[in-house]
Amino acid sequence: MNSGLTPSPSPAVAAAGPAGVPGSKLKFCRYYAKDRTCFYGDECQFLHDDQLGGIHGNGNSPLSLPGGGPAAVYPQPVTPVGSKKLDLAGLEAQRLAIPGLDGGAIPDTSLTDSYFSTSFIGLNGFGSPGEATYPRMQQRMTNSSSSPSLLNDSAKPYAAHDPLGSPASAMFNDFGGLTMSQRRKTPNPTASEFIPKGGSTSRLSNMSQSSMSAFSQALFSHPSMGGPTGAGLAPGMSLSAGSSPLHSPKITPHTSPAPRRRSHTPNPANYMVPTSASTPVTNSVSQPPSTGEIIQKATVGGTTYFYTDTTPAPLTGMVFPNYHIYPPTAPHIAYMQPKANAPSFFMADELRQELINRHLITMAQIDQADMPGVPAEVDSYHSLFPLEPLPPPNRIKTSNFGYITSCYKAVNSKDDLPYCLRRIHGFRLVNTKCMSLVDTWKKIQHSNIVTLREMFTTKAFGEHSLVFAYDFHAGSETMMSRHFNDPSADAYFTKRKWGQHDGPLPRQHAGLLPESLIWAYIVQLSSALRTIHTAGLACRVMDPTKILITGKTRLRVNCVGIFDVLTYDGSQNNPVALMPQYQQADLISLGKVVLALACNSLAGIQRENLQKAMELVTINYSSDLKNLILYLLTEQNRMRSVNDIMPMIGARFYTQLDAAQMRNDVIEEDLAKEVQNGRLFRLLAKLGTINERPEFQKDPAWSETGDRYLLKLFRDHLFHQVTEAGTPWIDLSHIVSCLNKLDAGVPEKISLISRDEKSVLVVTYSDLKRCFENTFQELVAAANGQL
């Protein structure tokens, strides 16, 4: 035990030994275990729990609190303060002079940290800030590593002199009536754990249930509980929940945020119905919610826990929809939409068309009769589809890799996912040490890099070939085809004949790209280079033909790692020794790409046109863009880093981040429109399997009788509405609303009219839902052979 009373400066108390142990000081032993054993044995000079019972357990005159409640029991006779020794034989007829109980003040030096190591904090034992709080308790709780500080800033400072009837003395009396449990508590992983929510409260532990009840009686009879706080706590022991008890089982509680996020989905309906652990709240929403909190009490492993109900109490004035879940567009999306006639129930046509195109390309296949040169299977890949025109047979090499290359879309038979295969024609791999570089490339995951998945050799194409497998991004196009496919864009840099004058100077929005788009590309390309260089590699493919554009502005660097394999030199001891030089070349290549984008022409990066290209950049773009291009293209004596251009990008990075987040908001809004469509389609599919079924269980009229007849009339109510003039009434919102009401089973009544208009049936949606579920389950049972 680490809590007790500090020794009094009185000589009588200092010299007296409790429970027949002469010379022991009036202070709890720090080494006294719960199994009633002490580290120092009989030679211990401090107070033990069983000795405390010898002092306090023989009195029969309880001290009463000012409120009239029972308190601790102490011996009646009083020993004179001036005596040096206590008569051990007559100890039962004597009472120790404890400072604070006889009107004396409790010295500040006597209030050690060990005094406040019990589980009760504050006057009322639950961290109430309404009465005196000792400074050392604040230090104790602040230095505690097991729980946060539970004190309130409004706590009053400690007064030097406390009378007998003061709150401090009353608290001292309350502690005297406590009996500390001697039962050793061990963790119980199988027990249900009650973890109270955090708040400005205390911890309750190491107490028996009987002592808790005795303490609560004295507690609620105290005058300090007569205020508003006490009125809220007294009726139902409604104590504010505190932090986790000291001896709670050492297992993750079921109320932990992480497991609840994985296993629990909030249900608005639970907020409207009171649970068995709570009572209805009659106050309005504007009233403090603390008055409606219900404190639950449970004992686990001998430890008593108090916790609040985790289910939110029902609040009057809050009504959630029970069937209609199509809210209007969020205002931050509605005001940024350029189109006023945006669809309400479905995603935008532009996004839908883009997704459909990606799906078409992903599922595309070829006719093997028309392309016999494409094998049906390569290694573990099948269903090859060329993504670019196949090279002619007489083609020798390409300007990028020095070999003939071709690109295919294929499906991996191991995971049934589409991949992009880049084939290097006629290459024979003679040194497998380069696989270490390939493994390093496979570990790089970046949003602006096409990830390399594997590399293998094959003869499926009729010759030795090296194949690189990358992630497949359907619908992507190269930067070359997007921005540099216009021959007229090079007119500004072509030489004029004698007597011809230069054409008009290209301008932004009149032949040149917007500067914001160029900065968006710079941010993405520099981010990709930063990740590659940090991994100790070099891109070496910073070229418009190897940069993919997905959507409007999304960039990805393609074909990474190919140069590292094709140019691998096995004679070098360190294969990455030349990487710093390649990284410097990446920065120059990035500068050429940015200059070509600024000129909107590849002719601008030629050496003879550099001066003219920089003049074009100076006239049309900001000085920051010009300085960035000059920095990347100018060779310097020191080693440069891609991080050096970050100050040049500056606040434009935040502009790109803002644009990306706004784009994400628009896509999420489009996704929200499609969330319920799958559910409604399943309802229609089930309804279609029931209606107009020709025969079931040898009954031709099965779909025309019983519950099925109601569903048939409901189908007419959904789709066959007519106006007063007899013309068809087509309203999609009516269909969606009725299906949602059917799925929810609302008690709303509708009238179903037969086709001959001789019968009118008034039913509720809940009745229709019951008929719908029973009928469909009957069909499912028959399909599974259970009927």
Swiss-Prot record:
The keyword NADP belongs to this UniProt entry's keyword annotation: no
Stretches the record annotates as Disordered: 1-20, 131-162, 179-210, 226-291
SUPFAM superfamilies for this protein: CCCH zinc finger, Protein kinase-like (PK-like)
An example Gene Ontology molecular-function term: protein kinase activity
BP-aspect Gene Ontology terms: mRNA processing; nuclear-transcribed mRNA poly(A) tail shortening; positive regulation of cytoplasmic mRNA processing body assembly
Residue segments, region Pseudokinase domain: 365-650
Disulfide bonds: none
Subcellular location as annotated: Cytoplasm, P-body
Domain of life from the UniProt record: Eukaryota
GO cellular component: P-body; PAN complex
Region (Knob domain) location: 690-787
The entry's keywords: ATP-binding, Coiled coil, Cytoplasm, Metal-binding, mRNA processing, Nucleotide-binding, Zinc, Zinc-finger
Ranges annotated as biased composition (Low complexity): 11-20, 143-154, 200-210
Binding residues annotated for ATP, in chain numbering: 422, 471-478, 545-546
Motif range (PABPC-interacting motif-2 (PAM-2)): 185-200
Principal subcellular localization: cytoplasm
UniProt keyword ATP-binding present: yes
ZnF start-end (C3H1-type): 23-51
Domain remark from Swiss-Prot or TrEMBL: The N-terminal zinc finger binds to poly(A) RNA.
Subunit text: Homodimer. Forms a heterotrimer with a catalytic subunit pan2 to form the poly(A)-nuclease (PAN) deadenylation complex. Interacts (via PAM-2 motif) with poly(A)-binding protein pabpc1 (via PABC domain), conferring substrate specificity of the enzyme complex. Interacts with the GW182 family proteins tnrc6a, tnrc6b and tnrc6c.
Function recorded in the entry: Regulatory subunit of the poly(A)-nuclease (PAN) deadenylation complex, one of two cytoplasmic mRNA deadenylases involved in general and miRNA-mediated mRNA turnover. PAN specifically shortens poly(A) tails of RNA and the activity is stimulated by poly(A)-binding protein (PABP). PAN deadenylation is followed by rapid degradation of the shortened mRNA tails by the CCR4-NOT complex.
Protein name according to UniProt: PAN2-PAN3 deadenylation complex subunit pan3
Taxon lineage: Eukaryota, Metazoa, Chordata, Craniata, Vertebrata
Protein's gene: pan3
